[in-house]
Curated annotation (Swiss-Prot):
GO CC list: plasma membrane
EC class (word): translocase
Organism superkingdom: Bacteria
UniProt key word RNA-binding: no
ABC transporter domain boundaries: 1-211
Binding site for ATP: G33, S34, N35, G36, A37, G38, K39, T40
One of the GO biological process terms: cytochrome complex assembly
Compartments where found: Cell inner membrane
Name assigned to this protein: Cytochrome c biogenesis ATP-binding export protein CcmA
Membrane topology: Peripheral membrane protein
Reactions catalysed according to its record: heme b(in) + ATP + H2O = heme b(out) + ADP + phosphate + H(+)
Species in which this protein is naturally found: Sodalis glossinidius (strain morsitans)
Length: 211
């Protein structure tokens, strides 16, 4: 995946411009920046949900506009909103998700719910759960997907330290098998050998480093 000269303007203010990055299989990338720097908007642009004001995204060397169907099959995007069905239970939400992906594995669903701390709530309607618990239902999808590209906005916010450790281990496993993780977080990652490359959005430009 590559982005070329990406720019974003909101309310007549340029959030970032001239953003050039390449993301290769095995990459874990953390987007950094102050509040209002455009981190969430950048993730939405990368997920194909918001058009950039300039620049291009390429997937497997093809412009995104030419391969959207292929791209979306390889993508999991989890934003601030949980994007779940509130009338369904956590178990039913994940069963529904597996149906979309063409898979069905009840054991995997219960294992995913265990990883995000929702065992015991699997048959409670999502509408009766807290916002954080609803977000954890969305995060549980990561244990069920075969998609190669994960774009995640503040995935650590809704989970405790143990859950964060499990999630970081999952990131490490995903990247070790050729997957990619692009995420934002205000929280430090749990101690791990796993290292993410950092892309910092500052003053309408971006810089890269390893952290």
């Amino acid at each position: 995946m590559a982005i070329h000269n990406l720019a974003c303007v909101r309310d007549e203010r340029q959030l970032f411009s001239g953003l050039n990055e390449e993301f290769a299989p095995g990459d874990g990338v953390q987007i950094e920046g102050s509040n209002g720097a455009g981190k969430t908007l950048l993730l939405r642009i990368l997920a194909g949900l918001t058009p950039p004001d300039a620049g291009e995204i390429r997937w497997r060397q093809r412009p995104l506009r030419q391969c959207r169907s292929d791209y979306y099959r390889e993508l999991v995007y989890i934003g601030h909103r949980a994007a779940i069905k509130p009338v369904l239970t956590p178990r039913e939400n994940l069963t529904f998700y597996q149906g979309i992906t063409g898979l069905r594995n009840d054991y995997a669903i219960y294992r995913a719910l265990e990883q995000v701390g929702l065992l015991g709530y699997e048959d409670v309607r999502a509408a009766g759960l807290s916002a954080g618990q609803q977000q954890r239902i969305a995060l549980a999808r990561l244990w069920l997907t075969s998609a190669s590209l994960w774009i995640l906005d503040e995935p650590l916010t809704a989970i405790d330290h143990q859950g964060a450790q499990a999630l970081v281990r999952l990131f490490e496993q995903h990247c070790a098998t050729g997957g990619m993780v692009i995420m934002t977080t205000h929280q430090p990652l749990p101690a791990s050998r796993y290292r993410m490359r950092k892309v910092a959005l500052r003053m309408a430009e971006a810089t890269s480093c390893f952290g």
